[in-house]
């Protein structure tokens, strides 16, 4: 739906985790059961209420980019606001009135995109009225010319135009069909391609190592003697880095695809390589390394969730995107199991059993993050292979679609 409506610029998400944390701190502090009940009911209720508004709209208006930039500015403002609030809450103990005030301001920011939508609707209405007024004036002028006695009945050769031949019409139709039907694969057809498995392997390495990092953030912080406040800040800020990765990767890849013709898998190569560096930074165990490493890993992890769905729709088509996309997302739990359980959990338990119940020091997670750094580098190489395999496809098909 998003790909069809916003064909020239894909959407983003990922900031909801930080918003829900603020909702818990304000409304359900110390009541986890109430919070879990809200999480169970609220998404379903919102979907039922708003599902009638979900449909395919033609968003190719003259002001589309301006309105999308407005949404982006609001989203970045929310991310910056949440980052400041999370840091303040983990440094100071905010009173109830302050938490309520910050949450109300957050709600105002969340609903502010409605203002952009209403403004866009008014602009479209005014544009339609102006167009109708111009057409009415033209019809009036034409009627006056017809009823006027001073008109010429001489044949004007300029009025005769040659109609396009049947061959040219057929040719244009066949070109359009080629662009529409190109690479519209179903799940079984996609799974028979090398591109599918390259993308799947890259996602196992990228998403799996990212989930392993956030799932073990508390234990990593404890082993490196970080305070509880610092650990809470790291966990809370993960949603911010996740969102910035999703937003940034989508925006940057869209920009370079439209302006430079760069195939989108190239940015998957870059982000997975940076994620490998982030894992090496965490493995070093240097003072402050967990802060820097978590930022790199969090941003690059979020990037995969922005790049993968878009690449899937572009390479395999949108007709069966739902099944293909959800099949590729299996890479996330598979990678999480491999890295969280079989790598990080196994090595930590082994080190903890030798030292007692808990493990302290860089040796607890150094080997695990070295392994994950190697895995993300492997994922980057898989994405590099996908880039070279699809480079000509992007130049010949995707860019032609965007220019239609």
Protein language model features and the residues they cover:
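Structural signature of the two symmetry-related core transmembrane helices
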Residues: 263-280
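Helix-loop junctions at membrane interfaces in 12-TM secondary transporters
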Residues: 282-293
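Long, low-complexity inter-transmembrane loops of multi-pass membrane transporters
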Residues: 54-192, 198, 393-404
């Amino acid at each position: 739906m998003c790909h069809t409506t916003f064909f020239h610029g894909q959407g983003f998400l990922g900031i909801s985790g930080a918003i829900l944390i603020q909702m818990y701190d304000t409304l359900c502090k110390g009541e986890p059961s109430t919070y879990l009940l809200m999480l169970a009911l609220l998404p379903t209720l919102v979907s039922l209420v708003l599902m009638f508004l979900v449909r395919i709209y033609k968003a190719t208006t003259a002001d589309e980019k301006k309105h999308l930039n407005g949404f982006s500015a609001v989203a970045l403002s929310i991310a910056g606001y949440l980052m400041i609030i999370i840091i303040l809450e983990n440094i100071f103990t905010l009173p109830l009135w302050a938490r309520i005030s910050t949450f109300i301001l957050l709600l105002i920011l969340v609903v502010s995109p409605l203002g952009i939508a209403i403004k866009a609707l008014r602009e479209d209405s005014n544009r339609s009225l102006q167009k109708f007024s111009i057409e009415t004036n033209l019809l009036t002028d034409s009627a006056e010319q017809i009823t006027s006695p001073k008109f010429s009945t001489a044949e004007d050769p300029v009025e005769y135009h040659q109609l396009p031949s049947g061959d040219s019409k057929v040719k244009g139709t066949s070109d359009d069909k080629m662009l529409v039907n190109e690479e519209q694969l179903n799940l079984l057809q996609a799974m028979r391609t090398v591109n599918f498995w390259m993308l799947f392997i890259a996602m196992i390495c990228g998403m799996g190592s990212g989930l392993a990092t956030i799932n073990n953030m508390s234990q990593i912080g404890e082993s490196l003697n970080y305070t509880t406040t610092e650990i809470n800040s790291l966990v809370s800020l993960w949603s911010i880095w996740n969102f910035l990765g999703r937003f940034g990767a989508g925006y940057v890849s869209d920009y370079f695809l439209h302006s430079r013709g760069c195939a989108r898998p190239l940015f998957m190569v870059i982000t997975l390589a940076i994620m490998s560096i982030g894992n090496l930074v965490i493995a070093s165990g240097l003072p402050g390394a967990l802060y820097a490493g978590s930022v790199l890993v969090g941003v690059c992890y979020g990037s995969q969730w922005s790049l993968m769905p878009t690449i899937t729709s572009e390479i395999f088509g949108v007709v069966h995107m739902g099944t293909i996309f959800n099949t590729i997302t299996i890479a996330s739990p598979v990678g999480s199991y491999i890295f969280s359980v079989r790598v990080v959990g196994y090595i930590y338990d082994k080190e903890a059993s030798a030292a007692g119940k808990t493990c302290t020091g860089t040796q607890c997670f150094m080997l695990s993050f070295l392994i994950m750094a190697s895995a993300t580098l492997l994922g980057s190489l898989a994405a590099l292979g996908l880039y070279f395999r699809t480079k000509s496809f992007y130049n010949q098909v995707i860019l032609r679609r965007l220019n239609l």
